[in-house]
Amino acid sequence: MRVRAERHRSGARLCVRRALLLALLTLWLAAQHMEAQLVPNLGGQRVGISAFQFLKIGVGARGVAMGEAFVAVTDDASSLFWNPAGLVQKMEDQVFVAHTEYVADIRHEYLGAMYHLTEADAVGISLTSLHMQDMEITTETQPLGTGRYFGFGDVGIGVSYARKMTDQFSFGATVRYVEETLDMLKMRSVMVDLGTYYWTGLGTARFAVVITNFGADVTPHGNLTQLDGTPVDDFQSFSLPTLFKLGFAMDPLLSDHQRLTTSVQLNHPNDNAENVRLGAEYAWQNTFFLRAGIKRTIGQRLLAADETSEESYMLGAGFRVTTEISTVTADYAFAQFGRLGGLHRFSLAFTF
């Protein structure tokens, strides 16, 4: 019996090693595919080469208030956006809604739900929307308006799965369908997010590696005519806003009554400069929360203003109450966006 049990444990360890190797190999292959876009321009500006920019808008007040240094912290339904491997960090089912008052009267909405199939497996579904009021069309000869209006909007639907391979290592993936509409033009794409979450075993230290919005280039299609009536049938292709994220977090203060979580994250986008995110969250009685975070572009001084980005600092707070039906968590975040003003985010989570 002892020999059989030992063989069983050895076989389980072998399966875990294979799963870990497969997950890391998948992330490595994805990174290699992006190498031509990312590595040669390390630290450079690559603005304007990708579509579906709404996919870069942070979801949920908690993650945003921590400076978006969140891939190694997320453990709720907002993991559907930040890191799908976060879905199995807690044995909780949750419905999550978020609203962002973005710049120029643009509104960003997010709805997500997660459900545990077993203690080690979880699935989730998410819906993202970016919308604004229709705008009047202007031309060189009619600068005050033509009387015709155009609309713009984005929508994304994602399905996620996460599995806890061991007590320390988790892996998750999301498949997302995205559609963007600009007047008579549309762009559609299917993309993938891949994420890992690893507890090091050294206290509360953990790190995460995530690749989001990974997929093929997209090309607009639709009926478009120039001012002289000439139809346009040749459109430029755009890459997806692929983003590689590496995060590390730990709890330097952890007791029965209070907790302090700190996090640092490196973001490596294919359409902008690399940047570092720093964040912190203080929790009292797991009921009241205070959060803060900053973003700095690589090459900028940490404690000085970032001269290359409108994003600066983030602040936020939240509270949690338990009802007969569920536990409700309400969060708020403020993000300073330089000359564009401040952004306000609100989110609610219903945990069952």
Where are these regions (language model features)?
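Subset of outer-membrane beta-barrel
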Residues: 37-352
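Short intrinsically disordered, low-complexity coil segments enriched in acidic
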Residues: 1-3, 22, 113
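Bacterial N-terminal signal peptides
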Residues: 19-30
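N-terminal secretory signal peptides that target proteins for export/translocation
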Residues: 1-16
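Sec/Tat signal peptide C-region and signal peptidase I cleavage site
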Residues: 30-36
